[in-house]
Amino acid sequence: MKTFLLYAVTAVAEIVGCYLPWRWLKEGGSIWLLVPGALSLALFAWLLTLHGTAAGRVYAAYGGVYVAVAIAWLWCVDKVRPTLWDAAGVVFTLAGMAIIAFQPRV
């Protein structure tokens, strides 16, 4: 559970770090959105270092959680209800994440 939570917090940091510049560019938001956006991306990079395995494995497993958090963002922030296809994609990516993240260590 701790691993999944760390991946989820990492995903939120990345999404916020990308969303704020997007708002500035796409929706004419304040240029000051770039400051918390940059800080959030720096936090994202630091959080990735807290995962205790090889970087490639971390990125692969993190990707599954990122998809789940992005779909939650779609629903909660963008106010777009996910489709059944979105939900199926989340299930499959989380299954892949679990296989990678929780494999036996030898």
From Swiss-Prot:
Top-rank taxon, per record: Bacteria
Q: What is this protein called?
A: UPF0060 membrane protein Bxeno_B1021
Pfam families attached here? UPF0060 (PF02694)
> Where is the chain membrane-spanning?
2-22, 30-50, 58-78, 82-102
In the bilayer, the protein is annotated as: Multi-pass membrane protein
Mind telling me which InterPro entries this protein's record contains?
A: UPF0060
Which family does the UniProt entry place this protein in?
Belongs to the UPF0060 family.
Which cellular compartments is it found in? Cell inner membrane
Cellular component GO terms held in the UniProt record: plasma membrane
Q: List the disulfide bonds.
A: none
Keyword list, A-Z: Cell inner membrane, Cell membrane, Membrane, Transmembrane, Transmembrane helix
- Which HAMAP family does the UniProt record give? UPF0060
